[in-house]
């Protein structure tokens, strides 16, 4: 019997997430990340995009799960309060029991305001994630509006192929390059860089977790999915799961 059964946690340092979507546009208008649009919708400032916070968890999850995190990791998040430029955020993760493949994660501002809560796990057999549990509690919507022309299982018009290099501007949705992101990312790993990417366990530079949503959206227009608009989007929940990771720069 161990001396204590105290639940242990690990945390990172306070970081200042940076706003990089103030020039984001889609469907002919600016986004919630524009100061004026945010103010018009009643927000005190333009929120920093949710996946930006994911980078602060990567050092913690690499410590807990090792290289398996990069190869089969799943981060599943429910956002609680927005963060604006200048605010500090700290990421936390519970230390799971030996052999466990899932753990709790959360982030807080310096004053204790919760930013997000969720789970992180590794595969191939992922336990139920934060979003799995939340979806199980949902009731079917009686009347869809924005998504009324879409249905579960719908396929895009074409098979999409996307790649990210260090200097490539990622388009109107994400008007910056990977190198520009790396200059402002909260947790920079040498494994992300052109100079030292070959030092990663896979011998190549890997794409940061927070940039995976950028990559998947790069060709999203090709799918031809129709939604009613104009509409201004804001993430409430988000999940990213690696199947055969990591993803590499220039591939």
Question: What is the predicted role of each segment?
Answer:
Residues 2-72, 127-239, 245:
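Hot-dog-fold acyl-thioester-processing enzymes
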Residues 69-119, 238-251:
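Hydrophobic beta-sheet segments that form the core/acyl-binding groove
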Residues 121-125:
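Short beta-strand edge segments in extracellular beta-sheet folds
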């Amino acid at each position: 019997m161990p001396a204590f059964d105290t639940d242990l946690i690990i945390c990172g340092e306070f970081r200042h997430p940076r706003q990089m979507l103030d020039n984001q546009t889609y469907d002919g208008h600016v986004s919630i990340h524009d100061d004026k649009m945010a103010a018009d919708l009643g927000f005190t400032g333009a929120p920093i995009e949710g996946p930006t916070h994911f980078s602060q968890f990567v050092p913690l999850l690499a410590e807990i799960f090792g290289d398996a995190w990069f190869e089969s990791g799943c981060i599943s998040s429910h956002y609680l309060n927005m963060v604006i430029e200048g605010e500090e955020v700290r990421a936390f993760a519970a230390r799971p029991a030996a052999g466990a493949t899932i753990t709790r994660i959360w982030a807080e501002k310096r004053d204790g305001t919760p930013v997000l809560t969720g789970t992180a796990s590794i595969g191939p057999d992922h336990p139920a994630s934060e979003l799995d549990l939340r979806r199980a509690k949902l009731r079917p919507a009686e009347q869809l509006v924005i998504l009324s022309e879409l249905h579960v299982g719908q396929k895009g018009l074409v098979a999409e192929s996307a790649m990210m290099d260090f200097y490539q501007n990622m388009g109107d949705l994400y008007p910056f390059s990977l190198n520009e992101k790396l200059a402002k990312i909260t947790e920079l790993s040498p494994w992300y860089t052109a100079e030292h990417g070959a030092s990663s366990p896979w011998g190549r530079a890997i794409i940061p977790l927070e940039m995976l949503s950028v990559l998947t959206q790069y060709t999203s227009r090709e799918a031809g999915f129709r939604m009613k608009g104009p509409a201004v989007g804001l993430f409430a929940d988000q999940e990213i799961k690696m199947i055969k990771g990591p993803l590499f720069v220039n591939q």
